[in-house]
């Protein structure tokens, strides 16, 4: 085993334990500190936290090392999935990819909902357009269905990998497979789509952030408390930061993808980075949510404890409830 194999074997155990503690903390905060007045928040926080937990669990289950071949891409898995077989590892890897996209969509969906709450006074119209956004979730679902239902040829992938990279130590990975030639073509198209998504998420998220901040300044009552103003602005900025987090994954992955295509060579460290880079948002995202949930709830409850302020803050509080 080389240095990277030893390093990432311990890396995954440490990172997964940290993430588990963060997600447990998130569930406790959501359950105990978001009551009836903050009911709508749960509709976004629970799915977001669950999707992150699933994505991180699938990443831990695979602990994938990606080998880019001429006609295929091998998945050398060092997680517990390797004891079940290459087909199970293949499913876990694609679930990790799909739920990683879902997390990003939920964050974008949350920002969209906040903007709608400021734009429309009619709650029915807000719910309608919030539901319309849900067609975005068809994208990871279609990707998952297409890639999983396509023919799997793990033996061919394994044979090509062994012939092209005979010097690698394959003993820790047991029996492995990966994406066949047809699946690799789909994967290449998906990589191109991710490069476009890496621009779409921050652009549309930043647009909605500026739109929401502008409406906050123009619509908010002069009698609205300073705490409510600060809380709403901080909440929107926090959501925008969450939307930008995936760029920590997509930009390096896109750069690595084009570098491999241009040079025709894959550096050793790049074989480990595809799955590892996905763990960065999984760690930072719950940290951001934990911070802003506690801060937003504390300020919201402080504002609503005053009967004088409550009347003037009712419009602004729609951003949360």
UniProtKB/Swiss-Prot annotation:
Keywords: Membrane, Transmembrane, Transmembrane helix. The keyword Transmembrane applies. Pfam families: 7TM_GPCR_Srd. One of its GO terms (cellular component) is membrane. Its main location: membrane. The chain crosses the membrane at residues 14-34, 41-61, 83-103, 128-148, 190-208, 240-260, 273-293. It is a multi-pass membrane protein. It is found in: Membrane. Belongs to the nematode receptor-like protein srd family. This is Serpentine receptor class delta-63. It comes from Caenorhabditis elegans. The gene is srd-63.
């Amino acid at each position: 085993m080389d240095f990277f194999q030893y390093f990432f074997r311990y890396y995954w155990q440490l990172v997964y334990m940290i993430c588990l503690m963060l997600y447990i903390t998130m569930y406790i905060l959501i359950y105990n500190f978001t009551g009836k007045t903050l009911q709508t928040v749960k509709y976004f926080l629970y799915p977001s936290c669950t999707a992150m937990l699933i994505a991180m669990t699938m990443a831990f289950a695979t602990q994938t090392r990606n080998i880019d071949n001429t006609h295929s891409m091998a998945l050398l898995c060092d997680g517990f999935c390797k004891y079940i077989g290459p087909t199970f590892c293949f499913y876990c890897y694609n679930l990790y990819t799909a739920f990683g996209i879902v997390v990003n969509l939920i964050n974008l969906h949350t920002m969209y909902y906040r903007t709608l709450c400021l734009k429309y006074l009619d709650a029915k119209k807000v719910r309608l357009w919030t539901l319309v956004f849900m067609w975005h979730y068809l994208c990871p679902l279609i990707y998952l269905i297409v890639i999983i239902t396509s023919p799997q040829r793990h033996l061919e992938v394994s044979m090509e990998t062994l012939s092209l990279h005979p010097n690698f130590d394959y003993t820790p990975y047991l029996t492995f497979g990966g994406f066949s030639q047809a699946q690799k073509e789909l994967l290449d198209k998906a990589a191109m789509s991710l490069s476009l998504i890496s621009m779409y998420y921050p652009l549309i998220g930043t647009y909605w952030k500026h739109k929401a901040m502008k409406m906050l300044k123009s619509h908010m009552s002069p009698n609205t408390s300073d705490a409510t103003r600060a809380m709403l602005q901080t909440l929107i900025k926090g959501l925008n930061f969450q939307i930008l987090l995936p760029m920590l994954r997509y930009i390096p992955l896109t750069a690595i993808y084009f570098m491999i295509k241009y040079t025709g060579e894959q550096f050793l460290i790049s074989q480990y980075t595809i799955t590892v880079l996905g763990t960065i948002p999984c760690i930072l995202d719950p940290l951001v949510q934990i911070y802003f949930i506690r801060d937003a709830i504390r300020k919201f409850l402080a504002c609503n404890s005053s009967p004088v302020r409550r009347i003037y803050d009712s419009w602004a509080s729609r951003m949360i409830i």
